């Protein structure tokens, strides 16, 4: 298994698809060190694939929030909540060797990534830990559908409308 590999999962449709892929894989004894716990991580815990998830917050649908409240004693053994200053701390992320998968809205040909704003001004996602995890993870990637609005808008653009992370090395 990958028990010693710490995974950081971003928020969004592609990161959720990755969680679903893990659910249907042969991998087990996973550990997640991330900022936000979402529905897919609860499914992994329920399936016995995710041993523990460490995060700062929850972003759950109403059904999953209810499920967690109803089974709090069970989830208490699998979830650790930490202050943001610890969960996003560069030294901790590096030491654990986190593999990061962050969602993005758009990326440009210069290596800049916009993971927070639509059209440069409307906030879609919080600022979050994508910068912390991108800079400090052992392996870091941004994931996104290739297009939006039924193929009308490309996720790869000449210049992003808002720079959240510069991914050049």
What kind of region is each of these model predictions?
Residues 8-14, 18:
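Glycine-rich beta-strand-to-loop/alpha-helix junction loops that act as flexible
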Residues 30-36, 53-54, 141-143:
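Short internal beta-strands
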Residues 97-167:
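C-terminal catalytic subdomain
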Residues 2-6, 169:
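Short, small-residue-biased leader/transition segments that mark boundaries at the very start
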Residues 18-23, 43-46, 93, 112-119, ...:
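Short acidic, glycine/serine/threonine-rich loops at helix termini
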Residues 37, 41-107:
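Ligand-binding beta-strand-loop-alpha-helix segment within the catalytic cores
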């Amino acid at each position: 298994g990958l028990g010693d590999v710490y995974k950081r999962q971003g928020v969004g449709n592609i990161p959720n698809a990755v969680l679903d892929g893990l659910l249907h894989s042969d991998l087990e004894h996973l550990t997640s060190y991330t900022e936000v716990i979402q529905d897919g991580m609860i499914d992994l815990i329920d399936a016995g694939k995710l041993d523990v998830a460490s995060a700062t917050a929850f972003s759950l649908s109403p059904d999953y929030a209810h499920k967690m409240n109803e089974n709090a004693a069970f989830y208490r053994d699998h979830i650790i909540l930490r202050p943001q200053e610890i969960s996003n701390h560069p030294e901790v992320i590096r030491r654990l060797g986190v593999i990061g998968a962050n969602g993005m809205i758009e990326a440009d040909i210069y290596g800049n990534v916009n993971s927070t704003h639509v059209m440069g001004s409307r906030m879609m996602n919080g600022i979050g830990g994508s910068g912390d995890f991108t800079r400090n993870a052992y392996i870091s990637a941004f994931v996104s559908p290739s297009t939006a609005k039924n193929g009308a808008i490309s996720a790869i653009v000449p210049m992003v409308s808002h720079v959240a992370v510069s991914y050049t090395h």
